[in-house]
Amino acid sequence: MMILWYNPFRRMIKVKLLKIKAFHYKNCEDGVELSFLPLFRKSEEDKTYELYEVAPDLYTFLTMSIVGKNASGKTSVLNLLNDVYRILGSFQLKDEVISINGTKLEITFYENEKIYLYKTELHKQFDLGNNLSFVNESIKVMNYSKTKKNVIFKEENYKPLNMKKELPDDISILFYILKNRNNYAYYFDDLVSEEGIYHKVYDLYNKGSINKKYWKYILQLFDEHIKDLKEIKNDVYVLTTVDQTQELSAKELFHVLSSGTTKGIALYTSAIQALKEGNTFIVDEIENHFHKTLVENLIVLFKDKSVNKKGATLVFSTHYCELLDIFNRNDNIWITKYDKKIILSNMYRDYNVRNDLLKSKKFYEDNFGTAVSYELLMNLKRTLMDE
């Protein structure tokens, strides 16, 4: 009798980002890089709660955090990640207020038993409006196997993928290999535009993976008085609470519900969408407007594989270092500093910190140079006292 060997990884065609590297990106130092791969030994507990097996013995993080002082570059790092996902998902990229004209990108990703190394330069062209052109593009490929897990980032192991570009200048050649894939990331900052937030959130609920049961629990998680919220036509809503039913415009609804409730509904709705699709969810300053327990529970949802069945990734920035104590590892924690340029370092790789110690304690001891300056606080206090 013939026995067919079943490879469970063959069905996983979702693109998984492994590393990004950038030059001339905004105010970041040249060669700034963000890796999604673990840097030290993986315990069985880590494989259960911290890591997702993309392919045999190839693991990526389920959660990652960017921490640092105010104005240290956390948002710029998240913007870089979001820009990369825009290229992977829509094969186009628009220039930004702080121009990224001249940026060079190196993107390493896994897709369908292969690892790709994509390089490009982004340039502004007059005839493309706000769209950037992709210049000097190249793609190299390596067939993945367990024996190659330690040479993923060594370019000499890749072979050039030759293709003739017959696309407009503002369309990446990644289109040829990823055109049938859903490679988007949800960036929470893109959702929160005051009253416009409700339409975007309800669109996720109505057209996405958020069924009636989830919707009810999400609403009541942030305001237990809400029984239901429906969009009956564009930007007109029916809000049902324990006391009454009201028909409200988006602007009126924005003032009836608290800011925390509005942002919380948006946060959890988009997080669940990412979980259901196995996509990446990016959140800047995750603790804003939310109770610490709600934020901790969101992080735990991404770490729990009974919920996170498709390997979705949560990447967030925070000032609240106690959140990092939820992490069992420290190689998924990245630290930003600003010294003429934005510098991104890894807690495990660049600092001598034992993994079994509380991360928050090390932050409060200012081991990473991220604490608020006591001297500056005292200068402000003395100035106020002298008035």
Can you name each region flagged by the protein language model?
Residues 2-86, 245-376:
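Switch/communication elements of ASCE P-loop NTPase nucleotide-binding domains
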Residues 2-35, 87-276, 361-374, 380-387:
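Phosphate-coordinating catalytic segments in nucleotide- and nucleic-acid-processing enzymes
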